């Protein structure tokens, strides 16, 4: 959606502020289709980090959680996933995966220097190992109450509009930590990525 919204801002009618307001309204309407009474909207598209300037222009109070994962585990997870054609074409070549991971980390670090109050980096390994502790800090940062942050039972009735529906319904686990180590003898390309 963000490329479409960006196009509206660049080529739309009216002055810049009006185009931003129209684009923000269009984007919000799209997100509210599934739950029109939602108080908070979460857009977990993996490439949103490339559009931080645009998102903050549209929604000045937006907050970004960037989940950083061990590069080799991240690469293996991408490489083993079957994506729609054109969606994540870099995910089938470890040189490309490495470039994307390292490039995204550099860009997020840039955004962090520009918008330190709007961005929080969380480590995947900490999230799955101690979700309550990590999420208490996130809730505090967002100004939300921290009670009932993690349920032992995934909410079967909550609306999830994403391809990872099945995964989102599973309990948090640590089975994927350092998973790359089990594959490195068979997929030595993993070793070209940093060990962090």
Regions found by a protein language model. Name each.
Residues 46, 126-130:
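Acidic, metal-coordinating catalytic cores used for nucleic-acid/nucleotide bond scission
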Residues 1, 69-74, 127-128:
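Conserved nucleotide-binding/hydrolysis micro-motifs of P-loop NTPases
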Residues 41-43, 63-68, 121-124:
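Structured core elements
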Residues 38-53:
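Conserved adenosine/adenylate-binding substructure
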